Structure formats: C-alpha cells, structure tokens
Amino acid sequence: MSKSTAEIRQAFLDFFHSKGHQVVSSSSLVPNNDPTLLFTNAGMNQFKDVFLGLDKRNYSRATTSQRCVRAGGKHNDLENVGYTARHHTFFEMLGNFSFGDYFKHDAIQFAWELLTGENWFALPKERLWVTVYETDDEAYEIWEKEVGIPRERIIRIGDNKGAPYASDNFWQMGDTGPCGPCTEIFYDHGDHIWGGPPGSPEEDGDRYIEIWNIVFMQFNRQADGAMEPLPKPSVDTGMGLERIAAVLQHVNSNYDIDLFRTLIEAVAKVTGATDLGNKSLRVIADHIRSCAFLVADGVLPSNENRGYVLRRIIRRAVRHGNMLGAKETFFYKLVGPLIEVMGSAGEELKRQQAQVEQVLKTEEEQFARTLERGLALLDEELAKLQGDTLDGETAFRLYDTYGFPVDLTADVCRERNIKVDEAGFEAAMEEQRRRAREASGFGADYNAMIRVDSASEFKGYDHLELNGKVTALFVDGKAVEVINAGQEAVVVLDQTPFYAESGGQVGDKGELKGAGFTFAVDDTQKYGQAIGHLGKLSAGALKVGDAVQADVDEARRARIRLNHSATHLMHAALRQVLGTHVAQKGSLVSDKVLRFDFSHNEAMKPSEIREVEDLVNAQIRRNLPIETNIMDLDAAKAKGAMALFGEKYDERVRVLSMGDFSTELCGGTHASRTGDIGLFRIISESGTAAGIRRIEAVTGEGAMATVHAQSDRLNDIAHLLKGDSQNLGDKVRAVLERTRQLEKELQQLKDQAAAQESANLSSKAVDLNGVKLLVSELAGIEPKMLRTMVDDLKNQLGSTVIVLATVVEGKVSLIAGVSKDVTDRVKAGELIGMVAQQVGGKGGGRPDMAQAGGTDAAALPAALASVQGWVSAKLQ
C-alpha cells in the first residue's frame, strides 16, 4: 500500500532528522523582513540571511516542509493551474539544508538513500536520471563512481539560457550574492508516456519529471560578474511534496494524489458537481489551499500587491464554482476539509478557521454581486467580436467595473479560443500597475546589505548602562575603521544594554560615551546576530576597538516597558471579550503609544471597548508578577504560549507570563509587575483592512494626560453652556432640541422663499414653438433647493424646458427639468451635459430631470446663453 501525502511529508523529515538535521517549522507565506519577495516561494527563503552570512543559527543542518505560493508575477501565471498535471498556486517544498557543514558528497548520498532505500521511498534505481552543470565534474563523478548511475543517465546541462551561468543547472539568488551549480533528479514514468530526458528536444513531455533539485552554493557573484568562492560552501535542496507523492502513489498527475482526490470530492459536494473529471474542480481544489493559508498568514483581499494576488485567486475559484453550477457561497466551506487533509501541516490554519472562513465568505459575497453582470457583458462583447482577440479596453472595463482580474477574463476567452489584448489592458491600467510596482520593490543587491561577522550580547533586561567595545562601524552601509564628529553611522558593540527593534517594540535611544567622544543613538536595529546603534557622532572620533559606555534613555525605556506589558494584557482581554479567533496581526510599542492590529470582522461596540479597558485595568490593580522563563519552543507552545504574528523564533524561547491572565512568547522589555502600568486607556478603535481592526492605547502618565484632557474639554463645554459638568448632559440635550427646532423653522423659511422665487421666475419664461423655456442664474439659493424649484416651475409652466444655476463658493450647481411631453425631443441629461461641459464639469440624469456641477463660474453666463439656441434646434 502506497504512503499518504502526510506520511511522505513525515518520512522526509524523519529521514533527515536521523541524519542530524534540525526539523524547522514552515515559515509564514509572507516573507519576514524581505522586501525582495512577494510570497515565500522556496524552502530556503527563511534561511536566506543564514546563507548570506547575516544571521547565525545554533544548528548547521536543517530540514523543513515549507508552505509556498507562486502566483504573483505576470497576470497570466494562473491560467495553467488546474489544466496541467503539475501547475499549482500553493505547494509544499520538502528541503534539507547545510550551512557550511556537509557538501556535495553527503547531499547526493542522502538523496539517493532516501529515494531508493528499502526502509524509505524504495524507488527503482533504474527509473532515476540526473543532470549536473556542464563543468561540475565533482558532482558527475559522485553520481557515476560512488552512487553507480550509468553514464547514459547522467546528463550535463550547459548555459542554455543565452548567457554565462544562465542555465537550468546553475542557481542564483539574484544578480549578486550566493550562487552555484545544482544537480537535479528526474523520475522516468515509462515509455507509455510521451517525452524525452532532460536536455533533449522532447524534454517538455510528461515522461521524465524532475523530483528533486540539489543546489551547491559555492560562489559569491560580484557586481562585475566575477565568481568568488565562498569560505563555507552550503547546500539548499527542494523537492515538491505533491510531485514525489504522485511518483510514490503511482499516478501521473499531482491532482490524482490522495490529498487532491479528497479535496476534489469536497469541492464536488459543496458545488453540486457530479463529473469528478471536470477541470474546474481541480482549479478550486488548488485555490482553496493558497487562499486559506494566505489569509491565515495575514494577507487580506485588496487591490494592491499581495492582497490583489489573493483576490485574483479567490475570484478565479468563485467563477469556476459558478461554471459548476454553485448557487450560493461555497468557497469558505472548503476550509474545514482542507484542515482535515493537511494533517499536522494545518494546525495553524485550524486555530484561525473562523477568521479565514469569514474573510473568504465576505470576498465571495462581494464578487458574486457583480459576477453575473460581468459575465453577461463579456458574453455580449464576445458575441459581436470580429476576429480572435478581445480588446484591452473591454478587459480593463471588466476589471474596473466588475472586479474581474484580467486572468479571469482570459480564462473565459481561452475556453472559446479567443485571446486578450494584454498590451491594451496594460496601457489602460498603467496607473494601478505603477502603484503596485512601487510598493512591491523587488530585486536587491545582496552585497549592499550590512554584513556583520561578529555577534552582540544583549544585556538590556538587567542593565541600562554598560561598558562595551566597538567591534564594527558602518557609514552608508560600508565598513569603516573610524568615524569623526558630524558623521552618521552604525556602531556595533560586543555587548549592549540597547534593545534592537523587534516584536513590534521600537529600538532604544541614548548615548555611547568614551574618551573624548559622544555618539547620540537615535535608533537600535538588528543586523543578523549583531546589534547596531544608529546615530551621529557629536564630538571627537570613534574607531573600531574603542571602549564605550552605553547609556540607554532610562525614562523612555520605562514608558516603552509599560506599553509593552499593557499590549500583552490587552491581547488576552480581547480574546476573552471578543473570542479566541482574535490573533495579533501587527503591533507598534513606542514610548508614547501602543498600537495593536488584530483579526476581527466588525467594529467593536462601545460596550466591548469599555469591557476590554476595564479588564486590563483590573489586572493592573491585581498587581500580578510579570515573569520570564526560557524554554524549548515546543514546550512553550504546549504550555499555551501565544506566538506573535510574523516573528521568527529560535528553538529556545523567552516565555512571558502575567499571573494566570497572559502567557506569550516575547523577547521585549517589560514592567516587573502589572501594577507598574498604573492606568490603561483606549484612545481609538478603527479598521485597517477587511477583517483587521486596530486599537491605539496609552498607559501610565500618557493615560493620565488623556483623562485630564477629557476633563478639561468637558469643563470648557460646561462653561460655554453656562452650567457645570454635573448637568452637562441635560444642557447638551436642550441645546440640540433647540437647534433642531431652529433648523426646522429655517427650512420652512427657505421653502417659502424658493416658492416665491419660482413664482417670480415663471413670468420670465419665453415661448419656443409652444414650449416654455426658462433659463436663469439664481443668487443666494442653496444647490439642494434647485430641484424643489424645478418641480414647482414644471407644475406652473406646463410644456416646458428649465435650466437653473447657482454659484456657491466658486462652484457651479446646475439642474435641468423637462416636462414629460417634451422629452421625446429634448432630454434633460443631454442638455445638462452640454451646459456642464462649458463650465468645466459633467453630470447626467433622467430624460426629465438631470443635475451637474462645474468649477468655472466665470463661464456660466455664456453657457446659459447657449441654451436657447440648443433647445430651439431640438424643437424644430
């Protein structure tokens, strides 16, 4: 009996654990502090800083099963998903990594043992082919002489992409940085399937399938293209879980493995589909994986960047559900079946199930309102299409009006053998794409990053001043030996009391002092294992090796500590008041305010805000001890400690507990007891995105300042109302009631004035072929009164055409009215459009009533003068 996908995943991790590898959890699909990536798309992403020498781990061998998404490039990336055997938006990448430990020999031997060993995957050796980079004789000889693969099944691949080192078998992180040759392992499905071995003209067939890529990072590519050997070569490997599952389960398509079969059956159930071979079932089964895990990792549907990619995938899935005949929202119902089929890899998704389902349901409901109308419009356009290409403007209109991502339009067209004018679409939405490009900012020169070989020991939990030694200096990202007065720099010390920005807590400020110099620290940041003090040398000179006294701004740190501890209390209180679906989605802890973003689908009620505030203040009054313990990550999670969104954790973590009320993983600085916080006040609650709320709050002196400010405002209002704060409510209600009465009386007077003005105006109408024409600019009339006046005048004049205008604060307001018996010749919408165009505006409406605005008041007299000629022509 073949292994299940879950068993294959576990077997891979178990194998490498037995070879001394640390099993590391999958990182978030949103790369941590990496602007060069839209989504995590490979197992090595979370180790990038380790490979670059910017970070160090307490292990030199690692293995992972990494969740990945590849759907964020050009908009047609999605079109093959569901239609081919191996295209996915979401997949799991199995990988093993060596950070300066083993190299080619062990990497190849490990792979061969796992794939062919009787106790592991037990694949037939004669079915395996390998490729190596053309000049990588070392790897070639290991495969031939040590592993024993015949020469005819070892293929050298050269620079097949038109440039030096541009090869399927040479891997590069970017234009600069770590790179090296790779060897790939292929599985031969047999001669009953068309295709040829890699490097042959038939290599695109499905017979020979790549199952494992083993990268040997042995060079550092310079900006001029030179390849410098790395001092410690490393290994990065990747094997698609779905691909190896297809091989081990003896199927040719990834969609036929157990995981997808189960999901496809679930899709059929919720959509009512009966043909399990329908491609739309495969599309939806793939898309629920990427969408659910993206939402769980904090991505929300939007029109920019990651959120737009998510929106595209959701809407493509919904449209395929529509094709299957789904009559109601269905997509969110697949989260439960997905959690079941993912097993241990779906634990985080299970914790956030309610939130994920709500986000997907809301997005589907919003799109469902326009899907039918958009499809009808597309059908109309395709029915009258001359040729085989839909114009880009129509594709853009579908996107702009109906929310159709262009790949969804392309999907529909593809089914009818019609192409989409992509160039025209790109031109039509240039502004939107420009914003997305600016925000994504991909591509980086990795050699330009600050690289610190040394490590800094943080001692700020117990000290606010400390003597240390300068181990490195950087100016404009470049290492220097000395800095002089007036220069801005990054100073690295061997040990420091300064806290580097992390976990939402801002970096410390303060001073570094020594013999004849003073360095003002404006911020503190992490650079791998080093802590950098950013600031400016105000006096003297500072050089590498100098002794310094590091002094943290104590008062500022104290305020930060209170705010950070209050953030933990508020997080726990929110989960008690709103529910356990509340999860942190971001935070900022500064000396002035704390800001906390969390998952929740609606605005908090005033009573809920008060309840959270009261609950936090109750814990402050309890004066609970705030304690920290260092323990293994798994033990901390078993204890119930909550992990913070987007944070990376070592295997040994710091667990912060506040009595029995709150337990979280946290490396920040905190008060000693909850009573130190003094007072907690929420100053705002707002939404930042669909399903995400934000609270801002203050503590201690800041909270007291808000109390005093509120009291002062109340006293000022009481003074204005000639009362006191005790009877302020009654006074305000009386003023509001009097105001309502006066507004009512004022409106009555305005109505009377308008009626009188209408009566006066009716005498100014001129007769055009039996139709009364009235055109007038009115002074001192509010724009909203114009409609009432037109209605009155139509009743008085009978067959009539009316144009009225008024100017308020330089802005022109226009209205046109046409009696119903005249609308066959004069339409109010056309008339008002003609006038509005002359005053720099636009407008529209019904044939009998239309309104418009404009910005050019000086042009109004001429515009009104043109009405009589225009109407006369229409009445001929």
UniProtKB/Swiss-Prot annotation:
Catalytic activity of the protein: tRNA(Ala) + L-alanine + ATP = L-alanyl-tRNA(Ala) + AMP + diphosphate
Residues that, per the record, bind Zn(2+): 564, 568, 666, 670
Cofactor(s) the protein requires to work: Zn(2+)
Major enzyme class: ligase
Keyword tags: Aminoacyl-tRNA synthetase, ATP-binding, Cytoplasm, Ligase, Metal-binding, Nucleotide-binding, Protein biosynthesis, RNA-binding, tRNA-binding, Zinc
Example GO molecular function: zinc ion binding
EC number from the UniProt entry: 6.1.1.7
Gene Ontology CC terms: cytosol
Function: Catalyzes the attachment of alanine to tRNA(Ala) in a two-step reaction: alanine is first activated by ATP to form Ala-AMP and then transferred to the acceptor end of tRNA(Ala). Also edits incorrectly charged Ser-tRNA(Ala) and Gly-tRNA(Ala) via its editing domain.
Official protein name in the record: Alanine--tRNA ligase
